[in-house]
């Protein structure tokens, strides 16, 4: 839709409360000018493209003095990329200097504005093609609130194994394909086609079989993990049993065991962020439901004070899809002030839900007070890392410690600006390198061997508060955070993380994500069935310096660790760490697995559970190059190895109080789990104490298992057993 020719009426309003999205969002429009996007042609019926109308409404808002609310009357608004604002932008952890993706399409763009509320009014935003859903660029006091969002045809393809088995000696799968995807069976391949653009009629993207990357979600256990994709190795597509199904047969006779699994597939180019805050301050996102973010997640970059509250990152299960994000959900790269993430749900991303870090730049040359620096990771470049007046710190890559005398103020910077490449320059060189002039001469060690050092902007390091959130069905880590300012991770629930729930690195070897932590509190969280280790300090230093850990001042208290085995805490290069008043138990859960096919009278089969073994042998704690560690007044259930392993440190650095832990020696207790079984209709089939089911007569029965785990009496999921009367 085009811009309205007449100026729409300005609508001063008072307070409103709009509910329905993660509680109620309170909007105080007193003294604000409210601009209605439908006055500019936006279509709340969802029939027309509203991109140009939304852009026109925002352009008008820029001409209005004072606080402004851009309002979407309740409805469904489709936004196609062709008529959105375009900007050349370079974004952390995406495509680096690749010129093929330098131009971003932005659905809702707040640019060079102040005191703006984007109020969705409870509406649904439907995105098409490749675009950033919303962005704030060089703006302040911006709020995005009160809408849900989804994608018509995400570039992540989710397929469900509807059935699997063996027929005539050949294994097969039948896969369900959601309505949103266009596909074609081409010989022995499946070709996937994205939605077709209105201008070209061509699909926005195409792919074959399992693309470049795959992970799998098990709805029965609500777990997601990275894995190779077994659906599309050598095989033959036979026919379509039903609409939007493909039957795939294989050359072997091993029955697939993945009925019900959802395979999530994509290629790996992070061409655009899902949302972006660039050189902006006091940006708030609240009361949203984000069904899918293409390319990457919400990125804060060289910005200040960002708040995310009551946001649900979760796909609409009615769509047949489960993936809610192409990669991370939230990435804060070089942010100052406070990053506050509260009361939100993170479900089924393709990478880490939260990653908060700075960026280490490699020093390549040094002369007196001048440094040459370079972005090292291919996914990050093109934007400035320093402004005049910022503080720079040089870090020795071998120790990951600040170099003595190498902290200075920035006087001037020559390098990428984040928004373009000067004519006649090589894009890769220009976008990846910069020259920084400091207010003092560099130390002799840096001048002699600049390649041994990396640089961090310590001005753009935030205070972090992550509280009241839920992390579930995550294939990676839950929270990554590296900032020297206070970090509080409190009252969150982590369920079934596939890697460390909390990961603290400081990396000058791979991703070059900075820096050290100096004040971390992890309190009141629940870690259910976590991966090992649950909390992981893992800086990339090659050498340890006694008494100078990379990370320090960490308090971990009053948390519940409900384990299926493994290590609670692995601390490398960390000091001044206290682990106290925590509770460690076995995860009280029992899952029962049974036959996938009907039995015949007289048949027997065995049902199995995931009951834990009598004891776990992994040490509960490991420390490497650590110092001043206190483990005190924690409680431990039976069945664990209450062992503390140490390396590259003196054992006297570990203080144990009332925990009964053993240093570098096993301390294993046993807690055998007795499982009992029952059949709801024993006349149809019986089950004995070993889980052996015997079919007696035609009909259906349910088998259930029970056990006491971690002091809690638990009942398994029921397994249906069907007994046929004829052989």
UniProtKB/Swiss-Prot annotation:
Signal peptide: none annotated. Specifically cleaves the branched blood group B antigen at neutral pH with low consumption of recombinant enzyme. It is therefore a good candidate to participate in the development of universal red blood cells by removing blood group B antigen. Keywords: Glycosidase, Hydrolase, Repeat. Pfam families: Beta-barrel_GLAA-B_II, Beta_helix, Pect-lyase_RHGA_epim. Gene3D superfamilies: Single-stranded right-handed beta-helix, Pectin lyase-like. Residues 220-241 are annotated as: Disordered. PbH1 repeats lie at residues 336-358, 461-483, 484-506, 517-538, 551-572, 574-603. It catalyses: Hydrolysis of terminal, non-reducing branched (1->3)-alpha-D-galactosidic residues, producing free D-galactose; Hydrolysis of terminal, non-reducing alpha-D-galactose residues in alpha-D-galactosides, including galactose oligosaccharides, galactomannans and galactolipids. SMART domains: PbH1. InterPro entries: Beta-barrel_GLAA-B_II, Beta_helix, Invasin/intimin_cell_adhesion, PbH1, Pectin_lyas_fold, Pectin_lyase_fold/virulence, RHGA/B-epi-like_pectate_lyase. It is an enzyme of class 3 (hydrolase). Its EC number is 3.2.1.n1, 3.2.1.22. Residues 221-230 have a biased composition (Polar residues). GO terms for molecular function: alpha-galactosidase activity. Belongs to the glycosyl hydrolase 110 family. A subfamily. Alpha-galactosidase that specifically removes branched alpha-1,3-linked galactose residues present in blood group B antigens. Has no activity toward linear alpha-1,3-linked galactose residues. This is Alpha-1,3-galactosidase A. It comes from Peterkaempfera griseoplana. The gene is glaA.
């Amino acid at each position: 839709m085009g811009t309205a020719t007449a100026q729409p009426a300005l609508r001063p309003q008072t307070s409103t409360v709009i509910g329905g999205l993660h509680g109620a969002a309170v909007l105080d429009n007193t003294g604000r000018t409210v601009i209605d996007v439908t006055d500019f042609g936006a279509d709340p019926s969802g029939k027309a493209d509203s991109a140009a109308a939304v852009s026109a409404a925002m352009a008008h808002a820029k001409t209005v003095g004072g606080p402004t609310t851009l309002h979407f009357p309740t409805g469904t608004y489709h936004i196609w990329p062709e008529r959105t604002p375009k900007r050349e932008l370079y974004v952390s952890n995406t495509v680096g200097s690749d010129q093929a993706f330098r131009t971003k399409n932005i659905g809702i763009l707040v640019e060079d504005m102040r005191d703006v509320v984007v109020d969705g009014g409870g509406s649904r935003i439907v995105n098409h093609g490749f675009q950033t859903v919303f962005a704030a660029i060089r703006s302040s006091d911006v709020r995005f609130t009160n809408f849900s969002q989804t994608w018509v045809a995400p570039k992540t393809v989710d397929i469900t194994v509807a059935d699997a088995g063996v027929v005539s000696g050949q294994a097969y799968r039948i896969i369900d394909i959601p309505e949103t995807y266009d596909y074609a069976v081409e010989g022995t391949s499946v070709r996937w086609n994205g939605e077709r653009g209105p201008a070209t009629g061509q699909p926005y993207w195409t792919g074959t079989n399992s693309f470049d990357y795959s992970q799998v979600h098990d709805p029965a256990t609500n777990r997601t993990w990275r894995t190779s994709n077994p659906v599309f190795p050598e095989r033959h597509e036979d026919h379509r049993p039903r609409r939007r199904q493909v039957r795939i047969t294989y050359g072997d006779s091993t029955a697939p065991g993945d009925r019900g699994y959802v395979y999530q597939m994509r290629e790996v180019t992070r061409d655009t962020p899902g949302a972006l805050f660039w050189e902006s301050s006091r940006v708030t996102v609240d009361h949203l439901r984000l069904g899918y973010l293409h390319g990457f997640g919400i990125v804060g970059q060289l910005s200040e004070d960002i708040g995310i509250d009551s946001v649900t990152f979760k796909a609409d299960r009615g769509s047949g899809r489960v993936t809610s994000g192409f990669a991370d959900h939230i990435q804060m790269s070089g942010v100052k002030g406070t990053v506050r993430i509260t009361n939100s749900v993170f479900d089924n991303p393709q990478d880490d839900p939260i990653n908060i870090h700075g960026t280490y730049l490699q020093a390549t040359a040094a002369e007196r007070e001048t440094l040459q620096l370079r972005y090292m990771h291919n996914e990050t470049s093109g934007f400035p890392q320093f402004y005049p007046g910022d503080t720079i710190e040089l870090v020795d890559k071998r120790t990951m410690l600040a170099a003595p005398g190498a902290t200075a103020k920035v006087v001037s910077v020559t390098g990428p600006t984040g928004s373009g490449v000067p004519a006649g320059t090589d894009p890769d060189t220009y976008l990846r390198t910069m020259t920084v002039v400091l207010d003092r001469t560099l130390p002799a060690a840096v001048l002699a061997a600049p390649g041994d050092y990396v640089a961090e902007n310590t001005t753009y390091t935030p205070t972090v508060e992550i509280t009241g959130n839920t992390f579930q069905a995550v294939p990676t880590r839950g929270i990554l955070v590296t900032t020297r300012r206070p970090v509080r991770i409190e009252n969150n629930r982590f369920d079934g993380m596939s890697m460390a729930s909390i990961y603290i690195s400081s990396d000058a070897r791979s991703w070059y994500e900075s820096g050290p932590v100096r004040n971390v509190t992890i309190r009141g969280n629940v870690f259910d069935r976590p991966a090992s280790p649950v909390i992981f300090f893992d800086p990339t230093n090659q050498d340890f310096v006694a008494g100078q850990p990379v990370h320090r001042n960490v308090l971990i208290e009053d948390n519940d660790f409900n384990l299926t085995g493994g290590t609670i805490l692995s601390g490398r290069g960390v000091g001044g760490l206290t682990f106290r008043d925590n509770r460690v138990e076995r995860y009280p859960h029992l899952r029962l697995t049974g036959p996938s096919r009907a039995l015949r009278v007289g048949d027997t089969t065995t049902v199995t559970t995931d009951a834990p073994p009598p004891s776990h042998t992994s040490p509960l704690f490991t420390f490497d190059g650590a110092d001043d560690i206190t483990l005190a007044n924690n409680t431990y259930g039976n069945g664990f190895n209450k062992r503390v392993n140490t390396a590259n440190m003196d054992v006297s650095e570990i203080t144990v109080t009332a925990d009964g832990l053993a240093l570098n020696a096993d301390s294993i207790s046993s807690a055998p789990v007795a499982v009992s079984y029952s059949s709801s209709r024993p006349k149809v089939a019986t089950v004995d104490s070993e889980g052996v089911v015997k079919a007696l007569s035609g009909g259906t029965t349910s088998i259930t298992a029970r056990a006491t785990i971690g002091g809690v009496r638990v009942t398994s999921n029921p397994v249906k057993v069907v007994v046929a009367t004829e052989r």
